[in-house]
Each structure stands twice: as C-alpha cells, then as structure tokens.
A protein has these predicted regions:
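Flexible, glycine/small-residue-enriched loop-and-beta-strand segment within the central core
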Residues: 67-77, 82-147
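Extracellular beta-strand-rich, repetitive "passenger/adhesive" scaffolds
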Residues: 61-63
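Terminal amphipathic alpha-helical/low-complexity segments used for targeting or macromolecular assembly
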Residues: 1-59, 116
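Short, glycine/charge-rich beta-strand/loop segments that flank catalytic centers
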Residues: 47-48, 66-68
Length: 148
C-alpha cells in the first residue's frame, strides 16, 4: 500500500496532513526560519542551510532573501541559477530548475493542485473523525529547463 507521501510524488490525490509529510514540512520551516534570519552576506551559512534543506543546489547558484518552500528536499537547482527575493516554491512534488536560469522577484511555483470542478474538489461524505481532508489535493512536478 502506498503512503500519502508516495501518492504525492506519484501525482495522486492524498492527505496533506499525513504525519510523514507534516514532519518534513516542520523540519523545512525551521531551516527556512534560520535561512531567512541569516545575513545575506553570510554566504557560508546560507549555503550550508540550503544544502541541508534542498534536494540539490548547483555551483554558482544562489537564493535571495525571503525564500519560502514546503518540503525543500523536492527542489533541485542546477548550476548558475539565481532565484531573486520573495520567491515561494510549494514543492509537494519535484521542482527541477536547469542550469543558467534566472528567476525574478516574487515568483511562485506551486506543485499542488485541486480539481477545478467544486463537486470533485470537496469530499461530499467527509467525516471529521476520519483524519482525512475535506478536499482533494494532489501535486504535479515542475521543470524549468536550462537557459530559461
């Protein structure tokens, strides 16, 4: 049987309140708090925090101040990538950014999605004791190819 985390990565509907997923999010939020409180000139500390939090980050790549993400470890950044200030990456699934990519300020990348039709989006027979969400959500991967 697939875990909720495996369902997320497979692009299937799943429960975002699963303990495995929540634990990953909390750990990432703690690292983000440290990253965003670190002086932008302290590149050694910022680099160490990014390497601990992200799936990978390439050579000569940087992320500016006020960065936010969900899980962190689903973000893979190539070489010579600049992610400007105030960016948000909701990485419930994989986000791959190729080499030589420049990302402007305030860019938001969301892997999470919901059905557009409200009848499909909400669980009609939802029971609050079930531990499940009252709405359906899934996550799909994002790829930004090189030199974008």
């Amino acid at each position: 049987m697939e875990t909720n985390y495996q369902k997320f990565l497979a692009g299937e509907y799943c429960n975002h309140l699963d303990q495995e997923v929540l634990q990953m999010i909390v750990q990432t939020k703690n690292l983000l708090a440290r990253l965003n409180a670190t002086n932008i000139t302290d590149s050694a500390t910022r680099d160490a925090l990014l390497r601990q939090m992200l799936g990978s980050i390439g050579k000569y790549s940087s992320i500016d101040i006020n960065f936010h993400c969900e899980c962190g470890k689903h973000i893979f950044i190539g070489d010579k990538v600049i992610i400007n200030m105030n960016c948000t990456f909701l990485d419930d699934n994989i986000i791959k950014i190729g080499n030589n990519v420049l990302i402007a300020p305030n860019v938001q990348l969301y892997t999470a999605t919901h059905p557009i039709n409200a009848n499909e989006r909400f669980v009609n027979d939802w029971d609050e004791r079930s531990g499940d969400l009252f709405f359906r959500t899934k996550a799909l991967p994002i790829t930004i190819d090189r030199k974008s």
